[in-house]
Amino acid sequence: MSDSINTEPSTDTQTNGERTVETTSPSAETTAGESEEQVRDEWRHYEFDGDTKLSVENLDVWYGDDHALKDVSMEIPENSVTALIGPSGCGKSTYLRCLNRMNDRIKAARIDGSVELEGTEIYDPNANLVELRKRIGMVFQSPNPFPKSIRENISYGPRKHGDINKGLLARLFGRDDTEQEGELVERSLKQAALWEEVSDRLDDNALGLSGGQQQRLCIARCLAVDPEVILMDEPASALDPIATSKIEDLVEELSKDYTVVIVTHNMQQAARISDQTAVFLTGGELVEYDDTDKIFENPESQRVEDYITGKFG
């Protein structure tokens, strides 16, 4: 933790299946150049029914000397869509990558704090990163299909993890490897709302698909290894309105079975598809986290209201 951080610790209580999360914003001394009024936000109070999937406590991230994320604490409920919004450079993508340790790949990155997946610390030195990234999948901003067939894009992950060879799919479907693979490909593409468009050309190169189809293929590829959490970093930012609408419909459908955390610059998109929204502002600070309707209709923080209404950012 940096000496520049001066916050009261977050509290977490649970009563009758309802979890309460409280956070306190940084003191005025922590935000050089901003007025006291800008940083004098009251603590946010967020309640949700059901179970917590991810729990983040006092998370800080530095890239060299740059303090990119400051003392973030929040809990993410399972089987829901959590949107992360904020201006460019506010730390929302950095935060997203912390949830499956993608920042570990950046040599200059230093991470302090705790992230738990169903009570298990993912930053434990003995954590299995391959297994972690199977449980918490990632879909990136730009579609990145493998230069292979559509079929191979889907089956690559399960084969790499040994699911097919170890007979996991045999137990699920009672068929040999070839039939298991076919079932897996069809199931994953149907989940990603792509099957009807590509079922007659599974052996075609995936690079021949449109941008929107490629992104849904990447989502299907993520689903093929049966994750519990799906992280999405602006998955529709490079797509046209029709393709974007399909991605949004897909995200809402996926939240019935998966926990989805999505970064978006599109506030209208966040309002349409998410159950709860976290607002990050310049300096890597989580300013407010609440039900999406509350964030967009009656935010507690004046800074969040100014951002939502376009007064800055």
From Swiss-Prot:
One of its GO terms (biological process) is phosphate ion transmembrane transport. Residues 1-33 have a biased composition (Polar residues). One of its GO terms (molecular function) is ATP hydrolysis activity. Its EC number is 7.3.2.1. Its main location: membrane. It is a peripheral membrane protein. It catalyses: phosphate(out) + ATP + H2O = ADP + 2 phosphate(in) + H(+). ATP binds at residues 86-93. Residues 54-308 form the ABC transporter domain. Residues 1-40 are annotated as: Disordered. Keywords: ATP-binding, Cell membrane, Membrane, Nucleotide-binding, Phosphate transport, Translocase, Transport. GO terms for cellular component: plasma membrane. InterPro entries: AAA+_ATPase, ABC_transporter-like_ATP-bd, ABC_transporter-like_CS, P-loop_NTPase, PstB-like. It is found in: Cell membrane. Belongs to the ABC transporter superfamily. Phosphate importer (TC 3.A.1.7) family. NCBIfam families: 3a0107s01c2 (TIGR00972). Part of the ABC transporter complex PstSACB involved in phosphate import. Responsible for energy coupling to the transport system. The complex is composed of two ATP-binding proteins (PstB), two transmembrane proteins (PstC and PstA) and a solute-binding protein (PstS). This is Phosphate import ATP-binding protein PstB 2. It comes from Haloarcula marismortui (strain ATCC 43049 / DSM 3752 / JCM 8966 / VKM B-1809). The lineage of its organism: Archaea, Methanobacteriati, Methanobacteriota, Stenosarchaea group, Halobacteria.
